[in-house]
A protein has these predicted regions:
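Glycoside hydrolase catalytic-domain context in secreted enzymes
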Residues: 1-188
Length: 188
């Protein structure tokens, strides 16, 4: 039987070098070149020890080759987390977050995020860079539409609904992805 995840993480961290820990904090971008003939070149660019990839192409061969490299060529075989900016849908496109907030229907947003999670997971995505919870204080800011507006309470209600939709009750479920609240304080 496998050790509980906390013990596995503690064990890995105790064996990692400083360089390996730093590489785990790195995130590469790949997959914007949709030419399947370049998959080998794309894979060569990615260090086996990195923690995550922004995964734009969602090509299963590319994903599998990069993951194989991480598992077989890194010293500890730590898998890569594949992330995608699915801020208002993945294959099915929904209104932007500001439009979602205008619905005053967080349950609907939760359902949309659950569908987004299912579609993203089927394409090999583990993690979305959503929801954006910056409170819009200045309408001139170019990313106002990615958030839920100017009211902190509304932002919180819709962000919570989004996270429930993406992650559900069981993060190990095959139709769920990790959510990532963004950005740092003061960005919006």
């Amino acid at each position: 039987a496998e050790a509980p995840i906390e013990k596995r993480v503690d064990d890995l961290l105790s064996r990692m070098t400083l360089e390996e820990k730093i590489l785990q904090l790195n995130q590469y971008t790949m997959g914007r070149n949709n030419n399947v003939n370049n998959i080998g070149e794309e894979v060569k660019k990615v260090p086996a020890e990195i923690g995550s990839l922004i995964y734009y192409d969602t090509n299963p061969t590319l994903r599998n080759n990069v993951q194989k490299k991480a598992m077989e060529e890194s010293r500890l075989g730590i898998p890569i987390i594949f992330g995608y900016d699915a801020i208002h849908g993945f294959r099915t496109v929904y209104p932007i977050s500001l439009g979602q907030a205008c619905s005053w229907n967080p349950e609907l947003v939760e359902k949309a995020c659950a569908v987004t999670a299912q579609e993203a997971r089927m394409s090999g995505v583990d993690w979305t860079f959503s929801p954006m919870i910056d409170v819009a204080r200045d309408p001139r800011w170019g990313r106002v539409a990615e958030g839920y507006g100017e009211d902190p309470y509304t932002n919180g209600v819709f962000a919570a609904a989004s996270v429930r939709g993406y992650q559900g009750d069981d993060m190990s479920a095959e139709d769920r992805i990790a959510a990532c609240l963004k950005h740092y304080i003061g960005y919006g």
